[in-house]
Amino acid sequence: MIKLIVLDVDGCLTDGKIIYSSDGIESKNFSVKDGLGISTWIKMGNQVAIITGRNSTIVQKRADELGIQHLFQGIKDKYRVLKELAESLSLKSYEIGAIGDDLNDYNMLNLVGRSFTPNDGNKEIKSIVDTVLSANGGDGAVREMIDTLVDENDQRDTFM
């Protein structure tokens, strides 16, 4: 049973686009569907981690808003961070699911028990994951992953 899901941000929780205003203010679009899925997953007693290569106050705000317990930003070696997190939580790799969309997620996705990529993920990533989702990044892909895991964990009644 999956107890922890690990999320990449750009290209998974968002569509991968970063918008800068003329004042240099960064913005990202997050899916409300993903957010509801994440908050419900947490309420069910499961855990969520974000491991992302960039640093962003917007991501910190979204993680706080959703109650995400583990946030790692500016990470170059996602595999190492996930391995350390799993050890600190006493989780085995088969108890972890993850979503990633590009080559910097490759090693992390090979570490987990259930791996996913959005429909618009990189072709190399599509070739190694367990499931290529029908939704694109930022457009409900994380929610689709959570729905899949809820069904596989036989937790649909709890999720509702």
What are these regions (language model features)?
Residues 27, 79-160:
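Mg2+-dependent phosphoryl-transfer enzymes with acidic/Ser/Thr/Gly-rich catalytic loops
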Residues 1-77, 160:
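Alpha-helical substrate-recognition element adjacent to the catalytic core
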